């Protein structure tokens, strides 16, 4: 739903250590045969491809809050900067999720709402091999070939950027 511009927030169990804003790539894990029609490139295969990118300009922490003495189960709330909590209804609506769907995904734990801005869907979806992963070593970050999508998220760079840096050395 991100690629269709309907989803304004992505709910995740984790968040990167990066500060906002940062670029996030959209990997389509859809079933075989997913396609999109681009005015420039025509019909393109989407599944198992990076189909676009967005800027994450804000991350909200989702946490469970219940009323003292209530028998009602705690509900998802957004933790505010002054450590207050407000209901997560608007965030869940922007994420195209019901509270039950969010709870099922988060398995009763806390999570994060990644806010989506500057959405860019590629005319031609890109293969993972066009990106380079970054692995943390004792000498700093080191490029590594990406052969499969990360299970949640990973730090990547576009292969073209890495090649340009290497040529400039």
Question: Can you annotate each of these PLM segments?
Answer:
Residues 1-169:
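Structured alpha/beta reader/binder surfaces that contact nucleic acids or chromatin modification marks
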């Amino acid at each position: 739903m991100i690629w269709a511009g309907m989803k304004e927030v992505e709910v995740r169990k984790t968040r990167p250590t990066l500060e906002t804003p940062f670029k996030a790539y959209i990997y389509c894990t859809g079933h075989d045969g997913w396609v999109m029609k681009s005015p420039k490139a025509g019909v393109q295969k989407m599944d198992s491809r990076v189909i676009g990118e967005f800027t994450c300009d804000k991350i909200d922490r989702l946490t469970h809050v219940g009323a003292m003495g209530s028998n009602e189960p705690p509900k998802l709330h957004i933790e505010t900067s002054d450590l207050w909590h407000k209901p997560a209804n608007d965030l869940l609506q922007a994420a195209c999720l019901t509270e039950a769907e969010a709870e099922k995904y988060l398995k009763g734990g806390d999570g994060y709402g990644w806010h989506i801005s500057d959405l860019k869907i590629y005319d031609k979806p890109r293969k993972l091999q066009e990106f380079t992963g970054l692995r943390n070593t004792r000498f700093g970050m080191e490029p590594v070939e990406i052969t499969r999508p990360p299970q949640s998220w990973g730090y990547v760079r576009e292969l073209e950027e890495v090649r340009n840096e290497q040529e400039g050395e």
